Amino acid sequence: MPEVSVVIPVYNNAGTLPLALDSALSQEGSLEVIVVDDGSRDEIETVMERYTADPRVCYVKNPKNLGAAGSRNRGVAMARGQYVAFLDSDDCWAPGKLKKQLRLLEDTGSVLCCTGRELMTPEGKLTGRVIGVSAVISYRDLLRHNSINCSSVVVKREAALEFPMEHEDSHEDYIAWLKILGKYGPAAGINEPLLRYRLSAGGKSGNKLKSARMTFLVYRYMGFGKVKAAACFLSYALHGVWKYARAFLLS
């Protein structure tokens, strides 16, 4: 059995998928890579033909469009590893990422580990801009600010199965992390840019107002009343103002 199951949802990203796949397959240790195709209309099948000889790679096509969350959930349901690692098809990992995370999970007893990230341009050029993470991320920390990037996460499979990703009209991964930390305790963080995250103006979070609305919905889907949801959202908004003010002052 593999120790880690890497789940890659893909939709019309034939141009970036090979970089993501190669970065996963080059990681040390025992792993499988599950590519879940959500009805792509580009050359995904042609890309995947290059990997048919690798027994670690499993390629499945959704019978109908499930969205990114549903595709990740399908991959988790198929996973055989003790841990699940998520990787979007337009991102990639630095060498040694999984090994470092598995070691930290073992040392800390946490069920979820995330890492820092370096931003890439839409064309795949590294920008040198790094976004770090804290060594320990509590449920309360996460309520104030979602510092956990999905493509950096390694999580115990049982926890991912218990709390699948839901509500794609919000930040579905954020809801899952909150539920996992709420039950199992703090996440462990590695403050190194082991994820290379591709910027995309067309992504779900590209529009700041849309992202803000989605964040408010996260708190509502968590079952918070309007007052508590508004208080959490205010904290989120203030953190965003501080982040951009700090970036401006340091520029």
Where are these regions (language model features)?
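Glycine-rich, basic loop-to-helix element that forms the pyrophosphate-binding segment
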Residues: 62-79
